[in-house]
Amino acid sequence: MNTKVKDLMITNIVTTVPHKSIQHVRDIMKTKKIHSVPIVNTDNEPVGIVTAKDLIKKFKDGTPVSQIMSKNIYTIPEYSDVYIAARMMRNKKIHHLLVTNEHKLVGILSSFDLLKLVENHRFVMKNPPTKTKKTSKRLRH
């Protein structure tokens, strides 16, 4: 399995900027039914991330997202192998990686995306190709 991050990442991502309000991010998550919102600068470079867990605490709705976002973000190039992403998530105990190309945000990869890959791989392994009569005859000779 030589799957790249690019093959699994979500590219249709919703982002926001640091000066937007926490309420804005809450509304995005609720409307889009997502659990994280990357925060980007004007050059579309990731500068933070807000997750649903960050929003559990009580904040005034007008508080800028820059005050609660995780600034210690983890990024991975889109052409990296998926096993590197999985190892990063496990070692850092995180559930989201921001995917970049030349420092620009191009996608997001979640632990759920990795689980889907494992599930699909297991399905393929449980359903190997069956032998046909021609294949069986060739094997005997």
Where are these regions (language model features)?
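The conserved cystathionine-beta-synthase
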Residues: 15-33, 40, 76-93, 99-101, ...
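Cytosolic regulatory modules rich in charged/polar residues
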Residues: 78, 104-141
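Histidine- and aromatic-rich ligand-binding microenvironments
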Residues: 7, 21-24, 38, 51-55, ...
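Bateman (tandem CBS) regulatory domains
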Residues: 2-13, 62-73
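Short, charge-rich, low-complexity interaction segments located
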Residues: 57-63, 123
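Short hydrophobic beta-strand motif reused across regulatory alpha/beta modules
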Residues: 48-53, 95, 100, 107-115
